[in-house]
């Protein structure tokens, strides 16, 4: 279909700011002919429409969560190591503190022990110099010792003794029916003294002996014996003493006794007639 030639079209102008036109000043607008040059009666076709832009692409998917930077992980590991080291140092300090406490406690006990040992040494030295004035009662009870004195109403043989009153003493051994009974085997010093006196003198022999009885022996065993003869002057008062003493190895259940030949001539004063022993 042919378009009418007299259809009015707006004129199109090309503008060239860099080229100068011979018909006008530089930068002037040149009219664009509406018809095709060389082809009168035909109009220039309209310019093509601008190209349509494609639709924008969809937004890219969200990227995954990024891993923590290497520096952050290193900082985390460093903090964990520092925490572990702190606890290790704390445990070491606690152990060191406990060790120092135990060492202080041991030093204190050692000082107390040294002080106690020093005091005991000083006390022992003083006891050696001035003697033990007040010995413990336990030591007195454990000491095997006896000192018996004469008994005025003694009328039998062997002699009977006073074991309770006056200066009499019995400890660690037993007094029974005129004799001392040994409870502990060991070495003993045994002694006896008898004082004889008379209004007149007939010079009869005077015997004084200490003997032992034990179920192991069939008869009495004489340990010590003394005999006096010609000890006085006829017709005069007289007094003589007999003393016996020696060390013996005695066993448990041994019984010790004292016998004299003339009981009527014995003076039973506690300072003159006595019988005793003590364990060495």
From Swiss-Prot:
GO terms for biological process: extrinsic apoptotic signaling pathway via death domain receptors; immune response; necroptotic signaling pathway; negative regulation of angiogenesis; negative regulation of transcription by RNA polymerase II; positive regulation of canonical NF-kappaB signal transduction; positive regulation of endothelial cell apoptotic process; positive regulation of extrinsic apoptotic signaling pathway. Keywords: Apoptosis, Cell membrane, Cytokine, Cytoplasmic vesicle, Disulfide bond, Glycoprotein, Lysosome, Membrane, Nucleus, Repressor, Secreted, Signal-anchor, Transcription, Transcription regulation, Transmembrane, Transmembrane helix, Ubl conjugation. It is found in: Cell membrane; Cytoplasmic vesicle lumen; Lysosome lumen. The keyword Nucleus applies. Residues 102-280 are extracellular. It is a single-pass type II membrane protein. Residues 1-80 are cytoplasmic. Residues 20-71 are annotated as: Disordered. Cytokine that binds to TNFRSF6/FAS, a receptor that transduces the apoptotic signal into cells. Involved in cytotoxic T-cell-mediated apoptosis, natural killer cell-mediated apoptosis and in T-cell development. Initiates fratricidal/suicidal activation-induced cell death (AICD) in antigen-activated T-cells contributing to the termination of immune responses. TNFRSF6/FAS-mediated apoptosis has also a role in the induction of peripheral tolerance. Binds to TNFRSF6B/DcR3, a decoy receptor that blocks apoptosis. This is Tumor necrosis factor ligand superfamily member 6. It comes from Felis catus. The lineage of its organism: Eukaryota, Metazoa, Chordata, Craniata, Vertebrata.
């Amino acid at each position: 279909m042919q378009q009418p030639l007299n259809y009015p079209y707006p004129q199109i102008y090309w503008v060239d700011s860099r080229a100068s036109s011979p018909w006008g000043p530089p930068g002037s607008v040149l009219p664009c002919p509406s018809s095709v040059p060389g082809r009168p009666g035909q109009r220039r076709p309209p310019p093509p429409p601008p190209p349509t832009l494609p639709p924008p692409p969809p937004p890219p998917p969200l990227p995954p969560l990024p891993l923590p930077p290497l520096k952050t992980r290193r900082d985390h590991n460093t903090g964990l190591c520092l925490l572990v080291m702190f606890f290790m140092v704390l445990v070491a300090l606690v152990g060191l503190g406990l060790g120092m406490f135990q060492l202080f406690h041991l030093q204190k006990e050692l000082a107390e022990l040294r002080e106690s040992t020093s005091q005991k040494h000083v006390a022992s030295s003083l006891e050696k110099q001035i003697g033990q004035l007040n010995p413990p009662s336990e030591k007195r009870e454990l000491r095997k010792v006896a000192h018996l004195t004469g008994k005025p109403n003694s009328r039998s043989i062997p002699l009977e003794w006073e074991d309770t009153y006056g200066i009499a003493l019995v400890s660690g051994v037993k007094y029974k029916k005129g004799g001392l009974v040994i409870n502990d085997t060991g070495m003993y010093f045994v002694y006896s003294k008898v004082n004889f006196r008379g209004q007149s003198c007939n010079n009869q022999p005077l015997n004084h002996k200490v003997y032992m009885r034990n179920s192991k022996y069939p008869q009495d065993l004489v340990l010590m014996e003394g005999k006096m003869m010609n000890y006085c002057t006829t017709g005069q008062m007289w007094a003589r003493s007999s003393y016996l003493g020696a060390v013996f190895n005695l066993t448990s259940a041994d019984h010790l006794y004292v016998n004299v030949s003339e009981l009527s001539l014995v003076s039973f004063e506690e300072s003159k007639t006595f019988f005793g022993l003590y364990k060495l």
